[in-house]
Amino acid sequence: MRQPSDHRPDGRIDMANSKVKAVQQLPSERQRDPERTRAEILKVATAEFARVGYSGARVDNITALTRTTKRMIYYYFGGKEQLYVAVLEQAYGDIRAIEQELDLKHLSPVEAMRTLAELTFDYHDKHPEFIRLVADENVHNAEHVRDSEQLGGLNSPILGLIQNILNRGYRDGVFHRRVKAIEVHTLMSALCFYRVSNQATVKAIFGYDMSSPTTRRRQRLFIAEMIPSWLQDPHPGRATK
């Protein structure tokens, strides 16, 4: 008997029929554990998008690296672009969740800012795939980030966290440089991002290996001390209004 086609007369894919087939093709264990299936697809997709970028990634390659089918990727995510947005949302969500787990209230403003800088450094250092994803999304002018309904809400808490530390520092008289939370965040991120994103070129041009354990320890200390010292400067020049 001829099987019904997933394509409508107008040539478009019948997603309802396609989803039914996708579920039917899954092993029974995977039908019972959709969250694990989705998580596995996201894990493989993250590695693939980080490796070759959005333009270079192929759904067929992601399918081949998972124990699932191409139909299931479309079932869970809708398509390559939606899958990429989901990867970005998870990548940003992971670091934001770790930041929110920090208990900084019992620390002095200086120690709190130093601790946040150390965490930011460590996360970037341990997750080069995050660096590559963000760099590639900037190549695409953040078009996929703008398509996400979640990323704005996911990322706003870090500014509140930094602002709280700043407010305590100003109140206690230990921070003198008047800055915005977004300025601290972008400066801290830039210092941690560059040492991972530019390791290869810096080593090739200057012979300076930023990935060596010794250099890593030195740079972690520099960045963790630099941010609080910058805020503590008693002669900061013209303050930000």
Predicted features, each with a name:
Residues V87-L116, R146-G153:
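Amphipathic alpha-helical linker/stalk segments
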Residues A112, D125-E149, Q199-F206:
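Amphipathic alpha-helical segments used for helix-helix packing
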Residues M1-Q25, L119-D122, K126, S156-D172, ...:
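C-terminal peripheral helix-coil segments that are non-catalytic and often amphipathic
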Residues E40, E48-Q82, A86-V87:
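Helix-turn-helix
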Residues E111, D147-L154, R171-L187, T240-K241:
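All-alpha amphipathic helical-bundle segments outside canonical DNA-binding/catalytic cores
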Residues T37-A45, I62, V87-A91, I95, ...:
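Generic hydrophobic, amphipathic alpha-helix propensity
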